[in-house]
Amino acid sequence: MSDRRPIATLPDLLISQIAAGEVIERPASVLKEILENAIDAGARAIEVRLEGGGIRRIAVTDDGSGIPPEELPLALTRHATSKIRSLDELESVASMGFRGEALASIASVADLTIISRTRGAEHAWQIDGGSLQVSPASGPPGTTIDVRQLFDRVPARRKFLRSEATEFGHCVDAMERIALAHPEVAFRLFHHDRAQRQWLPADHGQRIRDVLGAEFVGHVLPVQAAAGAIALMGMVTRPTAARARADRQYLYVNGRFVRDRTVSHALRSAYADVLHGDRQPAYVLYLDIDPGAVDVNVHPAKHEVRFRDSGAVHRFVSQVVGQTLAQTGGAEAVPAGVPDGAAPDAAYAGEPAAAAPGLAEPRAPYPAAYPSPGQSPYQGSPARPHTQVPFRLHGEPAGIPATDWQSLYRPLPGDAAPAATALRAAPATPLPTADEHPLGQALAQLHGIYILAQNSRGLVLVDMHAAHERVVYEQLKRALDDRALPRQDLLVPVVFHAAEKDVALVEEHETQLNELGFEMRPSGPASIAVRSVPALLARGDIESLARAVLRDLGAVGVSRLLTEQRNELLSTMACHGSVRANRRLTLEEMNALLRQMEITERADQCNHGRPTWVQWSVNDLDKLFLRGQ
């Protein structure tokens, strides 16, 4: 056994290097900390110059308030800051930085120089991070922080850096995240004295377009809602524009980029019915909440936050985004005022350039019931009548009682009358105009699978089974949502061993569990008894179901597991209760299905996230046949 070493105070330099290990991972970490300081200083224009991907040099110049010469040494002292003075200020902090560790940590692992000039000062002053000597310098009002030779003093850290190109890419990512959060600030980025990025001051919508591109904005839906002290705004992609990777997901809480599992879970819940396979949504969302209701001091790099009431945040985000995605079928087919020759992106997105600036407008109050947020980007489109004849096959009854939801998936009748699809004389189908139904009028059926329809833009092709599946699925969900969740009492309670924290969760969330159809009670210090469960799920594994619900409650303060399992059952029922392939439909039945799609939420995708229809404009068809070329 080795001799015991006495306890000793660590040198200040080593303390700063240890702190740097938590905060400074790579050049992008340095850039993030300096940019946040510039934002806190009130900068309206920031210039960044990099060399070697930020490994050899990071120089950030801003036009903020500057630092007086007598405070420059304090700026490089650990735990010295102008942001907070008390615990109360920490608990409601609104600035990006507040710990006073960043500059001291950077100076301990790199060569650092600060040149700063306050407004009204005769000249600038500079300080060297090594000697801490302050001397006169030249420079405009504002601050320049110059960092060179990152990790030269800590070779063990430097060997973990990647190539210069990779590190430069991370620096660009860090700058984009901050630029998206602060559209009022102008940014310029240079690498080896070559201009790489430039973003002028703009509103949120224009900044998103500038940073992420017109293609991204061309496939998004605007989000804007508020309820009490919480508000959400931004953009979410349509389900059809989901990505293979989760690489374009930007969440800001009070202007700070974070990764939060509560909001991530809420967004997955909102997209649950409309994403195909393992596709990932893209979004830029700004969540504003009372600073006292969120703790930002939970992660060394401030990448995570903790909400005081995570369940309320989850419900708000999930319902707002869910309502945004729940547009009726065909909303993208005929946007108002889009000429036939319009670019596909413009026609698809409903003029995103006009919708994006609306993100900067003041938020309207959002009722507690969370109706559809804001106005649709298609608000100029004529209202669609909601008095259509429901889609029915021959022999199907004319109506379904609202309480008889089981009849929605009754077995289909026998062969329906075949549609007249052969080439023969038939009445000419008038060309629909833009003020008629977005999905147009049915023309024929193809291979017993697809419906061909004509609208004012061109040709619409509908997968009739996928479309009818979504219609039936939404009817089933509405029928169950309108009634209390039935509960089934167990003859013999299911008792299982549980951790003490799970027993505490049962007591804490008793009301919420009852609303979900559960009756759970602690049956001892380390066991839980389940006495009743939702009737729809009574035949499942009760213990596994209860544990999964408690796991959700412990993680995000809310559980959508029962809703997801219920919807999975309804999806299967809808699939088996929908019109099958090779079933011949009449034109009247085809048109009835199109009309129901137009008044059904999420009808652009089936229950499994596959598209239910596609649109070809006349221009698209002309290109196939080389017309006009």
From Swiss-Prot:
GO cellular component terms, semicolon-separated: mismatch repair complex
UniProt superkingdom: Bacteria
GO molecular-function terms, A-Z: ATP binding; ATP hydrolysis activity; ATP-dependent DNA damage sensor activity; mismatched DNA binding
DNA damage in keyword set: yes
Disordered: annotated span: 364-388
Entry keyword set: DNA damage, DNA repair
Gene3D superfamilies tied to this protein: 3.30.230.10, Histidine kinase-like ATPase, C-terminal domain, MutL, C-terminal domain, dimerisation subdomain, MutL, C-terminal domain, regulatory subdomain
SUPFAM superfamilies, per database record: ATPase domain of HSP90 chaperone/DNA topoisomerase II/histidine kinase, DNA mismatch repair protein MutL, Ribosomal protein S5 domain 2-like
Record's function text: This protein is involved in the repair of mismatches in DNA. It is required for dam-dependent methyl-directed DNA mismatch repair. May act as a 'molecular matchmaker', a protein that promotes the formation of a stable complex between two or more DNA-binding proteins in an ATP-dependent manner without itself being part of a final effector complex.
Family note: Belongs to the DNA mismatch repair MutL/HexB family.
Protein name as annotated: DNA mismatch repair protein MutL
Organism taxonomic ancestry: Bacteria, Pseudomonadati, Pseudomonadota, Betaproteobacteria, Burkholderiales
